[in-house]
């Protein structure tokens, strides 16, 4: 197969599917292996005839051969590993990653809209303060914790270790928690709302959901509407482990997936175990009235459009802050 057609994540072979700037890692199935082989390779076998001659008979890839291809792909040196798949600029310990796959296993899927960014930290405070001007942060520390969350996905491949989960919380509903986690964080970093997931009721189901998220290549995720008391072994492992171990869907084997996820949760009046609290950075919102849903004094009523318009400037500011640091 052509070089760069197949990759693997934790020895699970797959393809990068989608348009530039929105690629996703999709595990290779037997059916897909057959289609790829037939598209790029002409298979044949020699069949003996009665007159002691042989004739070359061409054939399509069968299921057994597709299984061999899939098995070989997870360890073949031509099939390179992707540890981190990002559609926004990121930094490793060696510096800023250029488009494509770098030697550390970071793949930068550069979208056309982010070409030729010019990092500039000069107006960082003004740019970032204006981005969240409509959100009622309880304190300046909470606001700056959110700015730290914006920076986390950019420097995540650089950090040799774990990063805490950020938790956006409030005592009331409709204060803007989900908008902050999905529309602002996702809109700036990945150009679309942060992927949201509900925590399943059992740790086994949580582990399956987390493993699927990591294999797909998501770099940020939103745990929406967390219940009042947070206590999950699967979630604690996700926050603290450099690799996440789980059972590969549909198979009996266990796999270890590199865990470079930046995680944000939202909830009302959330409490957690002491062990979980050590792994969480709070971002508290405190509305000025008891009816935040009735608020109308927004500087930017169409938040998604505002984020779309300023995304490039905000990313240039964040990259400039990283460079200055």
Name the predicted role of every residue range.
Residues 173-175:
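Walker A (P-loop) phosphate-binding loop of P-loop NTPases
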